[in-house]
Amino acid sequence: MVDFGALPPEINSARMYAGPGSASLVAAAKMWDSVASDLFSAASAFQSVVWGLTTGSWIGSSAGLMVAAASPYVAWMSVTAGQAELTAAQVRVAAAAYETAYGLTVPPPVIAENRAELMILIATNLLGQNTPAIAVNEAEYGEMWAQDAAAMFGYAATAATATEALLPFEDAPLITNPGGLLEQAVAVEEAIDTAAANQLMNNVPQALQQLAQPTKSIWPFDQLSELWKAISPHLSPLSNIVSMLNNHVSMTNSGVSMASTLHSMLKGFAPAAAQAVETAAQNGVQAMSSLGSQLGSSLGSSGLGAGVAANLGRAASVGSLSVPQAWAAANQAVTPAARALPLTSLTSAAQTAPGHMLGGLPLGQLTNSGGGFGGVSNALRMPPRAYVMPRVPAAG
């Protein structure tokens, strides 16, 4: 405990007047009264329900066990309610002790006034004339010191007594068996084991009896025949589906084989075609070379390339085409066969038409010359008509 007598009145008075007061203690006492009232009501209701069940339709060992488990809980609620009520009363005692100590404590302004008066007396005590007044002031201050200390000691003693009267609260007792779940699990496991053992003991004689009887067959032909009867109606559609799949597979294989054969033929044809094209190209080159050589020799023998003359500003005409002078002279040697026909219309037509298919080109020497180019001229000339029907004069 704090030695309040060693503390000056300024400290004790300041602590008492600066605190929250007794209002918090009074509020706490009211709350404890409410808790006590609720516990008393709960205990009374619980007790009435238990007695109503056990004295009515529920009678037996289970009812007795329920009463034995519920009675401690009812007693605990009643005891706890009494403790809460006692706590409320003791809190009120502490609040009353505070109020008493507060009333006995010297107010801080009085103590401050006493100290201020002492300072004035000491300051004006030049010749010692204030000595008696200073002594009286110090005596009053001592009385204040003693009064505050007594008030604090009394408040502390009363609060300690009220606290010591309180009893510690206990936890609520268990109204169920904590090992009940474990015992239930053990009982269930034992029941399962017992049932399995009983079933095993019942099956052993039956198995021995079956072994004692002669076995008919190791294969269950009856069951297999029933199974075959159930499956056989479904085998025909399955076989049809399998046949269809086989047909599709065969068709696919045929197509693959045809494609493979075509691929092989193409692989064999490609080199042969390439060889044929290469051979034809070589033959064409050789033919053109031979034709060029023959043409050159014919031109050389006929003298076409021997002399070249040029005349500035003048050219011969073959029809509407301007040609060199040599071409015009050569063109006169070509005489169309149509001019020898006895018909006048044909003759006039032959005179107005060009001499031959090449439109007056200078091929006279080429056709009349006996050189090696005559074969080419004969090849380019149209074959003679086997028969020409004469025009009848009566037809106009």
Swiss-Prot record:
A cellular component term from Gene Ontology for this protein is:
peptidoglycan-based cell wall
The record ties this protein, via Gene3D superfamilies, to:
PPE superfamily
InterPro entries of this UniProt entry?
Answer: PPE_C, PPE_dom, PPE_sf
Classification via SUPFAM superfamilies = PE/PPE dimer-like
Per the record, the GO terms for biological process are: response to host immune response
Q: What's the domain of life for this entry?
A: Bacteria
The similarity annotation says:
Belongs to the mycobacterial PPE family.
Q: Per its record, how is this protein called by name?
A: Uncharacterized PPE family protein PPE19
- Annotated organism of origin: Mycobacterium tuberculosis (strain ATCC 25618 / H37Rv)
